[in-house]
């Protein structure tokens, strides 16, 4: 028995499913999850001593690669000053200034501890500001595990085959209207059915929790226009895309202005952090200046702020996103060519530093139903073949992959060569 197998057996007796987040259990691909001992650069090293080229990147935060020296040093220095104070710090102010400088649509920002906290709080703020109850989200888009958002959700909810999680009261779910991603007609229909009741739309600008689905050109501007027409707020959930698709996020890449933005992952540099922010008028409705309540014991804690500040400082350098995009383009092109050589039907979507693989005969994958029509069984086989080759992809057909600045051209070529061998076995 390998060390991973032994640890998993122990973990299953102590932790539900043996993991602290469902997708890690390999439910979507079968088999025993890897237990990781350490990571460095573009590589993971499991407890059995095997190295893997990593395209999960802790589910997105590791844009600089693992164990980056600038982040490591920032954390060490912060730890030496104390772990948490429960009081304001200078680093919170510096971090807020940096975030609002980098994302021009955010006049103000509030730090929280996770992406779920960010989206949950932004929705509460939108409801409080507008005085309305209903929200619009999209099939296959995942915005964390708040009750009102686990309705036709993506990510682990898709992997587990539970679009509506047990434990979510019908009274909560009834205020969530679900539309089709990339389909403006479905959104207009929802607004026209409830013209005075919708507080906000919340949307992933690139849907990264049903793999990787970029928006059609008219989609995000169309959502902005519909929100303006019906008096709702537009919340762009950039927990995944923020600082990954572009320095100012997917909203800058696709030229759309939200009322509120949710952030996470990269802004913590590997530490647990979330944030939400936007127009000053809306943010001033938040306690203590306004009536909408939100709080957190560890929000803005000094360790996370130090790691996040170091990460954002590094990725603000000239040329970072050109390099990241070139690496992702190279991988996507190589995978397409390798699949074609082996007569494997494959669609590869990619934007900035994120990508998705779809085993499908379709020419494009643009919505939830397209994803549901893909060959999940073939992905499972491909995943395990790639794992044997030393390449670690997301262990679910419904999760995006992530490039880092630590990946080299040699890593990309190794990955493409491995994929070619795996395609030949499919």
From Swiss-Prot:
Its EC number is 5.4.3.8. Belongs to the class-III pyridoxal-phosphate-dependent aminotransferase family. HemL subfamily. Pfam families: Aminotran_3. GO terms for biological process: protoporphyrinogen IX biosynthetic process. This is Glutamate-1-semialdehyde 2,1-aminomutase. Pathway: Porphyrin-containing compound metabolism; protoporphyrin-IX biosynthesis; 5-aminolevulinate from L-glutamyl-tRNA(Glu): step 2/2. It catalyses: (S)-4-amino-5-oxopentanoate = 5-aminolevulinate. The modification N6-(pyridoxal phosphate)lysine is found at residue 265. It comes from Yersinia pseudotuberculosis serotype O:1b (strain IP 31758). One of its GO terms (molecular function) is pyridoxal phosphate binding. Homodimer. The keyword Chaperone does not apply. It is found in: Cytoplasm.
């Amino acid at each position: 028995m390998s060390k991973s197998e032994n640890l998993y057996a122990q973990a299953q007796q102590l932790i539900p499913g043996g993991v602290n987040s469902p997708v890690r259990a390999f439910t979507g691909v079968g088999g025993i999850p890897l237990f990781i001992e350490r990571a460095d650069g573009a590589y993971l090293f499991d407890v059995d001593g095997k190295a893997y080229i990593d395209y999960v990147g802790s589910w997105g935060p590791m844009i600089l690669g693992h164990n980056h020296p600038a982040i490591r040093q920032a954390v060490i220095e912060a730890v030496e000053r104390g772990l948490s104070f429960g009081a304001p710090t200078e680093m919170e102010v510096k971090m807020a200034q940096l975030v609002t400088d980098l994302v021009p649509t955010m006049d103000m920002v509030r730090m929280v501890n996770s992406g779920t906290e960010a989206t949950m709080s932004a929705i509460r703020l939108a409801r409080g500001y507008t005085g309305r109850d209903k929200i619009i989200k999209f099939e296959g888009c995942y915005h964390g595990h708040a009750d009102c958002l686990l309705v036709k959700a993506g990510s682990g909810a898709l992997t587990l085959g539970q679009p509506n999680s047990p434990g979510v009261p019908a009274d909560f779910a009834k205020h969530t209207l679900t539309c089709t991603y990339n389909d403006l007609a479905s959104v207009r229909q929802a607004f026209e059915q409830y013209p005075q009741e919708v507080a906000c739309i919340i949307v992933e600008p690139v849907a990264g929790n049903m793999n990787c689905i970029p928006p059609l050109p008219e989609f995000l501007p169309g959502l902005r226009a519909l929100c303006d027409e019906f008096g709702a707020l537009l919340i762009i959930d950039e927990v995944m895309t923020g600082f990954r698709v572009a320095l100012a996020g997917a909203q800058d890449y696709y030229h759309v202005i939200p009322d509120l933005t949710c952030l996470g992952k990269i802004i913590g540099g590997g530490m647990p952090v979330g944030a939400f922010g936007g127009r000053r008028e809306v943010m001033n409705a938040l306690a203590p200046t306004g009536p909408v309540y939100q709080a957190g014991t560890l929000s803005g804690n000094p360790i996370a702020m130090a790691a996040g500040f170091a990460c954002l400082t590094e990725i603000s350098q000239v040329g970072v996103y050109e390099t990241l995009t070139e690496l992702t383009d190279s991988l996507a092109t190589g995978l397409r060519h390798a699949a074609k050589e082996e007569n494997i039907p494959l669609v590869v979507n990619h934007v900035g530093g994120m990508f998705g693989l779809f085993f499908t005969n379709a020419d494009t994958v643009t919505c939830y139903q397209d994803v549901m029509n893909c060959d999940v069984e073939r992905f499972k086989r491909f995943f395990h073949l790639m794992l044997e080759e030393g390449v670690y992809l997301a262990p679910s057909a419904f999760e995006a992959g992530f490039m880092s600045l630590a990946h080299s051209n040699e890593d990309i070529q190794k990955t493409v060569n491995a994929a070619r061998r795996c395609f030949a076995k499919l």
